[in-house]
From Swiss-Prot:
Keywords: Phosphoprotein. It comes from the Eukaryota. Residues 181-191 have a biased composition (Pro residues). The lineage of its organism: Eukaryota, Metazoa, Chordata, Craniata, Vertebrata. Residues 290-311, 558-569 have a biased composition (Basic and acidic residues). PROSITE patterns: SCA7 (PS51505). Signal peptide: none annotated. Residues 541-556 have a biased composition (Low complexity). This is Ataxin-7-like protein 2. Gene3D superfamilies: 6.10.140.1270.
Length: 722
């Protein structure tokens, strides 16, 4: 009788409408107690329960367990369900976690469930166990959450009769269940609530039955499997997005995406019934996933939608909460609302247990890692859950709560007087600026020395003046070489770059300058002994710079010497004396910006303008031995002034080769590097060191010019010499 009295008291408490704590936010507890109007009978029960238990404050649970077991299990009214697999009595709030921890994933447990015939008896039984005494629930009058009712009724219906009597199972009429052959039947009006209870169970994955259970267990499953079976069939039909490979063990179709990692590509390609080729569908799926429309992301939302729909459709009569358990329910509701990632609306009619265990992140997901939800189904769920659930084209309903699409960013932040130099690099002083400016100026100056200067392009010589371009290779190892001229012997000056002096010196060009390689400077011209010097300063920057260093260039050119050994003997036969085009290297006045070049002379002009070695005029001087303008390979550059050249020519001393070396400006600047440079003519071969005396090295003329202009200049030089 005591059990029935306690059950009647609990039912009376359930029938009362307990006000929500949200309505009393900021007010005292006394106002809530007055509104709740708790009877004195509850207080008597509390006193009675305190006799059989320890202190009430010692029985109060910690905050983490309050959502599962309530605030104080010593006097809270709560309900238990029995697991079909291990026959363990657990609370409905912790039933899902119990199944996942003890019996594996819920999807596998649900996959083994056969579709039993419907029977409207699931919501009739209530497993009433109290901390101090049990309470009874009827489907029509009891206010309970859909999850508690579905789970409790299902597991209780599967229990053997011995277990049910032991656990105080009761019916609304107060009649205990005596035999398994008498399942309680409900009137037809009670079927819709039972039907709605069943919708949420498959989504929670808690519908699982033991294969050896008594026959009364099958009616308790009522409409669960048909509902979910239709949903599974709808998912299996979409082969354009899902794997579709049939599992040989379970005989079920894989509902993962086309990019399933479980089955091989060959197995997925063999699936029949796809609208397009497998590769095309995979490419489309990946393209959609890049745009943020991946069905894999939508599948968790589909699960949430299925979870929420039944709780929203519940009629107002099927609502929750025991009178004494109301504080725990409202507490967990408010605790749950602190997380703004709940993207879908929650029904106020559902209890705290449903809120805690049916989170949008799916069971034991990581609730606090993503405080801001992803827009439109971007909820974070494990890949296994999303693949198990498959895909769905249904869109998510707009969420009720406010959420942000990205984490918040500060409008401003303190830099502590620093400056942003590069992404993530802040500087607090100007020392780096000075260093960078000095380094950049050094680099710019270094690079500018190697930049090519703009020089007027040289035109090709006329066809009637150009003889066969026969030339012998010049030895690049020599410090300075000059083309040897057949006919009247001249005093050649090497086109070396001389150090700058106070007088105007011969223009300096670094080794390998192709634009001025043929412009070999002459210290004395044919017209007299007066030295001709260019007004061009000696430190003129290089118009072109050889890519190879002089030492490397000399090695490369030395390799060619052996190939062209036979060139002098051929040229000896091909040079017919006076008819051969004679060439002399002269320096034109560059005051007008004209570059120096080599002028070609005919035989007649050569005869008229010939001169002796001592600088005096003569009719026709016999051709003397060739003069080589080579100096010692590693001599220091000796500056030669123009006045010295004049005095030497006027005194009548025999002309000698200038002992100057051809050093580039770069080597002069470095001062201590003994690298030899050479004058490389454009498209001309170098003369060998051991070439015969009568072999002439013809140099291509750099810039064509009329013979008349050359004769006028030479006559002017003659008059000055006299």
């Amino acid at each position: 009788m005591a059990v029935r009295e306690r059950a009647a008291a609990a039912m009376a408490a359930l029938e009362r409408r307990v006000p929500s704590l949200d309505d009393f936010a900021g007010q005292s507890w006394s106002s809530w107690v007055e509104r709740a109007d708790l009877p004195a009978a509850d207080g008597a029960e509390l006193e009675e329960s305190s006799k059989n238990t320890k202190k009430l404050d010692a029985m109060t649970l910690i905050k983490e367990d309050m959502s599962i077991f309530g605030h104080c299990p010593a006097h809270d009214d709560f309900y238990l369900v029995v697991c079909n697999h291990c026959s363990q009595v657990v609370k409905p709030q912790a039933f899902q976690k119990h199944c996942e921890r003890r019996h594996g994933p819920l999807s596998k447990l649900y996959g083994r469930a056969p579709p039993p015939p419907p029977a409207p008896a699931s919501s009739q039984k209530c497993h009433v166990v109290n901390g101090q005494g049990p309470a009874c629930r009827a489907p029509g009058s009891t206010k309970t959450s859909s999850r508690e009712k579905g789970q409790g009724s299902r597991s209780r219906g599967h229990q053997p009769p011995e277990k049910t009597q032991k656990d105080n199972l009761c019916q609304p009429g107060g009649l205990t269940k005596d035999s398994p052959g008498k399942p309680p039947m409900a009137p037809p009006s009670k079927e819709p609530p039972g039907r709605e209870n069943i919708e949420i169970i498959p989504s929670e994955g808690s519908s699982h039955w033991a294969e050896g259970s008594p026959p009364e267990k099958e009616p308790s499953g009522t409409r669960l499997p048909p509902k979910t079976h239709r949903k599974m069939a709808r998912k299996e039909c979409d082969l354009n997005r899902q794997c579709g490979v049939i599992n040989p063990e379970t005989k079920k179709i894989c509902t993962r995406l086309l990019t399933c990692k479980i089955h091989s590509v060959h197995q997925r390609r063999e699936v029949q019934g796809r609208a397009k080729d497998f590769d095309v569908l995979v490419a489309e799926l990946k393209a959609n996933s890049r745009k943020g429309e991946s069905p894999k992301e939508k599948s968790p939302g589909r699960k949430e939608q299925v979870l929420e729909r039944p709780s929203q459709e519940l009629p107002s009569s099927v609502q929750v909460v025991a009178a004494v358990a109301a504080p725990s329910s409202t507490f967990s509701v408010r605790a749950k609302q602190t997380y703004p990632y709940c993207a879908l609306p929650r029904s106020r009619a559902s209890s705290e247990s449903e809120l805690d265990d049916e989170g949008p992140c799916g069971g034991d997901g990581d609730p606090g890692l993503f405080p801001f939800p992803m827009p439109r189904g971007g909820t974070q769920a494990s890949s296994e859950e999303s693949e198990e659930e498959g895909t769905s084209d249904d869109l998510h309903p707009p969420p009720d709560c406010h959420y942000a699409t990205r984490p918040p960013r500060p409008q401003a932040f303190c830099t502590f007087g620093s400056r942003l130099v590069s992404p993530g690099c802040y500087v607090f002083s100007r020392r780096l600026d000075r260093f960078c400016s000095a380094l950049s100026s050094m680099l710019e100056r270094h690079l500018s020395t190697h930049m090519w200067k703009k020089i007027p392009p040289a035109a090709e010589p006329p066809a009637h003046l150009v003889n066969s371009p026969l030339s012998a290779p010049l030895s690049p190892s020599s410090t300075g070489t000059c083309p040897r001229l057949p006919g009247p012997t001249l005093r050649p000056a090497c086109p070396a770059s001389m150090p700058p002096t106070k007088d105007n010196l011969v223009p300096s060009y670094p080794a390998g300058s192709p634009s001025v390689a043929a412009a070999c400077s002459q210290a004395e011209c044919m017209g007299g002994s007066q030295a001709i010097t260019s007004p061009l300063p000696a430190n003129t920057p290089s118009p072109s710079f050889s890519k190879l260093p002089p030492s490397k260039a000399s090695k490369s050119s030395k390799g060619k010497d052996g190939v062209e050994v036979e060139a002098p003997s051929r040229k000896r036969k091909l040079s017919p004396g006076p008819t051969t085009l004679k060439r002399t290297c002269i320096l034109e006045p560059t005051g007008k910006g004209k570059p120096s070049g080599c002028r070609g002379l005919s035989a007649k002009t050569k005869t008229a303008l010939s001169m002796g070695l001592n600088g005096t005029m003569g009719p026709r001087v016999k051709r003397a031995g060739p003069l080589d303008c080579r100096g010692s390979p590693h001599q220091l550059p000796t500056p030669v002034k123009a006045s010295q050249l004049e005095n030497r020519g006027a005194a009548g001393h025999p002309a000698k080769a200038l002992p100057t070396n051809c050093l580039s400006e770069e080597e002069v600047a470095k001062k201590r590097k003994n690298l030899a440079t050479y004058c490389r003519p454009v498209k001309a071969k170098h003369c060998q060191a051991g070439a015969p005396a009568d072999v002439a090295c013809s140099v291509r003329r750099k810039k064509p010019g009329p013979a008349l202009a050359f004769e006028e200049k030479c006559s002017t030089l003659k008059s000055k010499a006299h």
